[in-house]
Every structure is written in C-alpha cells, then in structure tokens.
Amino acid sequence: MKTVTIDTVTLGEGKPKIIVPLVGRTKEEIIQEAEFVATVDCDIVEWRIDFYEDIFDFFAAAQFLKQVKKILNKPLLVTFRTKQEGGELALSDEKYFEMYRVLLNEGSFDLLDVELFMPAVGVGQTIELAHEKNKKIIMCNHDFEKTPFKEVIVERLCKMQELGADICKIAVMP
C-alpha cells in the first residue's frame, strides 16, 4: 500500500489515524473548537467549512483559515461537503471551484477534500493547483442510499486514483 505523509503523520502505515472535525458555525465557535482540539490526542483536524456561516466570502474565509491553522498543532484537512453528498450548504459547481482556488492560493492548510462527481475539468484543475501548492487531495464519494456493488466501488476508487487523488475515500450506507 502507498503511504501519504502530511507533516508528521503518515497515512497507510502503523496505527489507524484519528481525524476530529471542526463544525462550528461562527468564528467564535470555530476558534473555541480549534483551541480544544489542539489539546486532544488526534492525528488530523478536519474543518468542515460547509458549516461556517461566512464561507461565501472566500477571501475572508481563507484569511480566517490561516488563523485556525495557527491555533492547531496538527495537519488540517479542509472540506466543503456539498448538499448532494450530505453537506450543509448548496453551492454551484462554479462557486465550489472558485472557493477552492481562493483557499488554495490564500489559505493555510495541508489537505483538501474534493468530491469525485464534481465536473472533471474543475476537479483536474483543483488537483493540479493543490499539488503545485504542496497540498494533498482526499477524493471522496458518499452514497447515503445503499452500498453499491463491489465492482462499482472499485471503479470509483480507480477513477479517483486516475484523477490524481493522494487518498481515496468511499462512504456508503448498508
């Protein structure tokens, strides 16, 4: 199995890694959560930016991201989970990729979550920019209705790998 190293954390070897989310809606809630999580024994922190009430001001969110990263002494994963994949907010494809471009160019973090079924051109450009900025990509797909056949799951994981994901993730329901 291929390993992926983010700061001092190596995924794919040793013990399973623990990721703890930040899901505050306001700056104050997020700072409070980040200060607490900085003291917790976990490996990676995931900021679910789709919960953040001011996420649509992309530049300000990128600046705030720097503040959050500074509080944490752990690798930071940034995730905007779209509504169709179980997230909090609806966002057009164009705005999704614009947001990620701004965060990659202006923010401070280590990993970026990209959804497999977003438009291929935008996904490719986002992955390319992320890798230029030395960020790792977690590519994901969520099925809240069922567990697809094994062949479908393998096909999706292979597609993620072909697109350049560093880490491939599938989440399904029974």
Where do the model's predicted regions map?
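Active-site beta->alpha loop and helix N-cap motifs at the rims of alpha/beta catalytic domains
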Residues: 2-3, 15-132, 145-147
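Short boundary motifs at domain starts and secondary-structure transition points
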Residues: 7-13
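Catalytic alpha/beta core domains of metabolic enzymes, predominantly
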Residues: 111, 116-174
